[in-house]
Design a protein with these regions (language model features):
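Class I SAM-dependent methyltransferase Rossmann-like catalytic core
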Residues: 1-23
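Class I SAM-dependent methyltransferase SAM/SAH-binding core
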Residues: 32-84
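Conserved Class I S-adenosyl-L-methionine
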Residues: 38-40, 146, 164-242
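A short acidic, Gly/Pro-enriched loop at the edge of an enzyme's catalytic core
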Residues: 82-93
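A short SAM/SAH-binding and catalytic strip from SAM-dependent methyltransferases
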Residues: 91-105, 126
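A short glycine-rich, Lys/Arg-flanked "PGG" loop and its adjoining helix->strand segment in the class I
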Residues: 106-121
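Short alpha-helix
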Residues: 144-159
Length: 242
């Protein structure tokens, strides 16, 4: 039940799905969210779970203005998740549209594994190879992405057992190449070097001209490759293969 609910909670932020109605509450004692941002995943969390102690991480301290339930014990961990100390004995770690900034993620995965209690879960959405393929094709810029298989191997090597693992492809359509750039600036979920400050008048015109190859009857395409996973720390250490 926890696995199914957490998949849906992470999916809420990634796809714009509305939080679903809760029938049975689940309780989590100690939980960490990596990359809180505007708090969409946090909101979905409290629609479906009760939490005693919540640790909220982000690079920026403005997350402290996000609305939270009055009775929650909230603790803010401001800074690079790869550099700061993680809380101990967590029951769960969640993240949405943030892990792609950490590459390779092996060290973080191992740290998350170590801080979880036996049976604790790690649930997240991120992006995989092929994400924003149109932008990378035109600019040669973008974040490095794993294939789904590579990401699964990293989780297994950190010690996790995989419960849910699903890659998807979502194609958005826009009225113009400039609308694509405005969307990327507004979302800020991935670095592609498309900030307008980086463009000259000539390079921007060339980009818009070259983007014509991605025009369809429905509009100009922009492809996302999100991936959702839920994994857990085994109750007993996994035996190494002979």
């Amino acid at each position: 039940m926890v696995k199914a609910k957490m998949v849906k909670a992470c999916n809420t932020k990634n796809t714009g799905m509305q939080p679903y109605r809760v029938i049975q509450d689940e309780h989590i004692s100690r939980l960490l969210e990596i990359g809180v941002g505007s708090g969409l995943l946090t909101d979905a969390l409290f629609e479906n779970f009760s939490v005693d102690t919540l640790y909220l991480n982000d690079l920026y301290d403005n997350i402290q203005t996000n609305a939270l339930p009055k009775d929650i014990d909230a603790n803010y961990l401001i800074g690079d998740i790869g550099m700061i100390d993680l809380p101990k004995t967590l029951d769960g770690v969640i993240s949405s549209s943030a892990l792609q900034w950490i590459y390779p993620p092996d060290v973080l995965f191992k740290r998350v594994f170590q801080t979880l209690t036996a049976g604790g879960f790690f649930a997240a959405s991120t992006f995989v190879e092929g994400n924003l393929s149109e932008i990378q094709a035109l600019t040669g810029r973008g974040l490095p992405y794993d294939t789904p298989k590579q990401l699964m191997v990293r989780l297994n090597q950190a010690g996790f057992m995989i419960d849910e693992f699903k890659a998807d492809e979502q194609v958005l359509y826009f009225d113009s190449p400039m609308a694509v750039l405005r969307h990327l600036k507004a979302t800020g979920v991935t670095a592609v070097g498309t900030e307008q400050a980086c463009w000259s008048k000539q390079s921007l015109a060339k980009f818009c001209q070259n983007y014509q190859q991605f025009h369809t009857d429905a509009g100009y395409t922009l492809t996302y490759r999100p991936l959702l996973f839920v994994a857990h720390k085994p109750m007993k250490p996994m035996s190494s293969p002979l």
